[in-house]
From Swiss-Prot:
Binds 1 [4Fe-4S] cluster per subunit. The cluster is chelated by three Cys residues, the fourth Fe has a free coordination site that may bind a sulfur atom transferred from the persulfide of IscS. It is an enzyme of class 2 (transferase). The gene is ttcA. It comes from Chromohalobacter salexigens (strain ATCC BAA-138 / DSM 3043 / CIP 106854 / NCIMB 13768 / 1H11). Its EC number is 2.8.1.-. Belongs to the TtcA family. InterPro entries: Rossmann-like_a/b/a_fold, TilS/TtcA_N, tRNA_Cyd_32_2_STrfase, tRNA_thiolation_TtcA_Ctu1. This is tRNA-cytidine(32) 2-sulfurtransferase. One of its GO terms (molecular function) is magnesium ion binding.
Length: 284
């Protein structure tokens, strides 16, 4: 990163403080990192994971708890992948790291029918490999670089195409119960992350496997949300607040709320009211 002066320096410092504050708040709000944790930071070479690692390294130096960071990149053997970029960067910033080599690219290309997107299979293979490696190195937390917009996009993808009301939680336990996944950038705006990555001059590596695929459902949803935000500034922030303020009794999921038991609750409520009136009457 070149030296900044004047207004540029002020703008960068303001942005950096905002991102650090948001990451710190997310970590505290959801108990993402505790004393003694070993956090495996999944580094893809994109703007989000670079920003996540950069901010976590700063927090590590200033946090009231001691935790370990180790950066891990999964080399999926995509054609043209610049294998030297991440090791050189990680050596320069001085963080412990591993490069895990798995030819998931060939598997994805072989198994995905022509014209279909590779995202789902690629994601499953990548997740399985990273979870396994986290266990191998003794990492009890796996940090992913998803941000606020990723979470909102996933919410609408599941609503529109999956028939379910769910998103990406800031913190979750994996299905096998072995790994806790955290998303420290949960409160961060994608635009802020992109600007920060540009200021910091991270050596961005584009994804040649999925990033260029046309008509991705996620891209359609992203464009929809972008248009909403342009027409109604602040709408995405309001929508994000909504997923942190869920009222199960106002939805229709019988597993989340006991609708059949409302009559019992009504009887109990009326009985308590009658009892209260009787007490007041006796006191009078």
């Amino acid at each position: 990163m070149h030296e900044l002066t004047g207004k540029d320096k002020l703008a960068f410092n303001k942005l950096q403080k905002r991102l650090r504050r948001q990451v710190g708040n997310a970590i505290v709000d959801y108990g993402m990192i505790r004393d003694g944790d070993k956090v495996m930071v999944c580094l893809s070479g994109g703007k989000d994971s670079y920003t996540m690692l950069d901010i976590l390294m700063n927090l590590q130096r200033n946090a009231p708890v001691a935790f370990e960071l180790v950066a891990v990149n999964l080399d999926q053997k995509q054609p043209g992948f610049p294998e030297h970029v991440l090791p050189e960067y990680l050596e320069r910033v001085g963080v412990p790291y591993h490069i895990v080599e798995r030819d998931t690219y060939s598997v994805v290309k072989e198994k995905t029918p022509e014209g279909k997107t590779t995202c789902a299979l690629c994601s499953r293979l990548r997740r399985g490999t990273l979870y396994g490696f986290a266990e191998e190195i003794g990492a009890n937390k796996v940090a992913l670089g998803h941000h606020r917009e990723d979470m909102l996009e996933t919410l609408f993808l599941n609503m529109f195409f999956g028939g379910s009301l769910k998103s990406m939680p800031p913190k979750l336990l994996s299905d096998d119960g072995k790994h806790i996944v955290i998303r420290p950038l949960a409160y961060c705006r994608e635009a802020d992350i992109a600007e920060y990555a540009e200021w910091r001059e991270f050596p961005i590596i584009p994804c040649n496997l999925c990033g260029s695929q046309p008509n991705l459902q996620r891209q359609v949803v992203k464009e929809m949300l972008t248009e909403w935000e342009e027409k109604h500034p602040g709408r995405l922030e309001t929508m994000f607040k909504a997923i942190t303020n869920v009222a199960p009794s106002q939805l229709a999921d019988r597993a989340m709320f006991d609708f059949e038991g409302l009559e019992d609750k009504q009887r109990d409520f009326l009985a308590r009211r009658i009892e209260t009136f009787d007490v007041l009457a006796r006191e009078a």
